[in-house]
Amino acid sequence: MYGLINIGFGNVVAGDRVIAIVNPESSPLKRMKDEAKLEGKLIDATYGRKTRSIIITDSNHIILSAIQPETIAQRFMENFYEIERVLRETKK
């Protein structure tokens, strides 16, 4: 239950669909990105900037972001805590 997460430049991803947020520098991730492109499952949300993170979804889509993985992870946690806070308040 994470809601929508901002991944940069006005782009958002459904938090509940994300499996991993990783650094794109390793060879296996570069191959995964190339395979996703061939399969039509690559989404480039970098707006021409350097890819700093790769987001892997439960539907095997690969999303490229120009935001650092740590920053996106922090946004996940902020959204999670905000949703939890709202749920606690509505139960009172």
Curated annotation (Swiss-Prot):
InterPro entries: RemA-like (IPR007169). It comes from the Bacteria. PANTHER family: REGULATORY PROTEIN SSL2874-RELATED, REGULATORY PROTEIN TM_1690-RELATED. Belongs to the RemA family. This is Putative regulatory protein TM_1690. It comes from Thermotoga maritima (strain ATCC 43589 / DSM 3109 / JCM 10099 / NBRC 100826 / MSB8).
